[in-house]
């Protein structure tokens, strides 16, 4: 089913929110749902979609994100999701700065293509530890060099775990992918308030479409 522009924006926002929610979850608890993680990381490799739904496995990859958008914008449940919102704002700011640095964007695109080729040759899933490690290094070498850097808060025992830090960086890359899509769809932060009703209605329609 073809989505309208507002519904596409709602889907991109869900992808962004879900990725940032998982960043917070890994940093605080060391855990992330495998299905939610897969939905986020797979989106990184969908660089030439026919439609927005393709980026998120026909929308099924961001079910959690759609629910989170309802909680945050619909119920104004800000306090419970404060860290997620903080990361969302940080990623949107980072994505804007990346767009102003074409060389980094080209390096990011080339790196994603190389990792995708490695995946295909070795038949690896997006959540394979080797793939996550490669995504983590790509983030460090590209987006991670842009100042000011996104600061992650969490439990030190989880942040000291190498695999957790790799998952966090890979998820930040997934968040950037959704932020790029949000910008391409002419998404603006002001729409969260001024266009909140339209976004929520679109979010609800998309949720029903993929259910």
Language model features with spans:
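A mid-sequence, solvent-exposed acidic-amphipathic segment
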Residues: 125-165
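Beta-strand-enriched cores of mature, soluble protein domains
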Residues: 37-47, 146-151, 156, 181
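Charged, amphipathic alpha-helical oligomerization/scaffolding segments
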Residues: 11, 15-18, 22, 86, ...
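Charged/polar positions within long, soluble alpha-helices
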Residues: 21, 25-28, 96, 100-103, ...
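Long amphipathic alpha-helical segments with strong coiled-coil/leucine-zipper propensity
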Residues: 45-126
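Leu/Val/Ala/Ile-rich N-terminal alpha-helices, chiefly Sec-type signal peptides and the beginnings
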Residues: 1-74
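Structured alpha-helical bundle/scaffold domains in large eukaryotic membrane-trafficking regulators
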Residues: 28-35, 154, 187-194
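Alpha-helical oligomerization segments
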Residues: 167-211
């Amino acid at each position: 089913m073809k989505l309208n522009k507002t519904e596409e924006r709602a889907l991109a926002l869900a992808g962004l929110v879900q990725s940032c929610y998982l960043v917070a979850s890994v940093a605080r608890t060391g855990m992330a749902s495998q299905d939610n993680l897969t939905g986020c990381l797979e989106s990184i490799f969908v660089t030439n979609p026919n439609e927005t739904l393709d980026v998120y496995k026909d929308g099924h990859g961001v079910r959690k994100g759609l629910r989170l958008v309802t909680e945050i914008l619909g119920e104004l449940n800000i306090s419970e999701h404060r860290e997620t919102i903080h990361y969302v704002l940080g990623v949107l700011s980072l994505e804007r700065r990346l767009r102003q640095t074409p060389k980094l964007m080209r390096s990011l695109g080339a790196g994603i293509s190389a990792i995708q080729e490695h995946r295909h040759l070795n038949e690896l899933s997006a959540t394979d530890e080797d793939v996550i490690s490669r995504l983590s290094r790509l983030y460090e070498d590209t987006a991670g060099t842009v100042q000011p850097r996104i600061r992650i808060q969490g439990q030190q025992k989880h942040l000291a775990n190498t695999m957790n830090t790799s998952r966090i960086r890979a998820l930040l890359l997934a968040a950037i992918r959704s932020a790029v899509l949000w910008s391409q769809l002419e998404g603006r932060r002001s729409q969260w308030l001024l266009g909140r009703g339209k976004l929520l209605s679109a979010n609800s329609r998309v949720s029903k479409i993929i259910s």
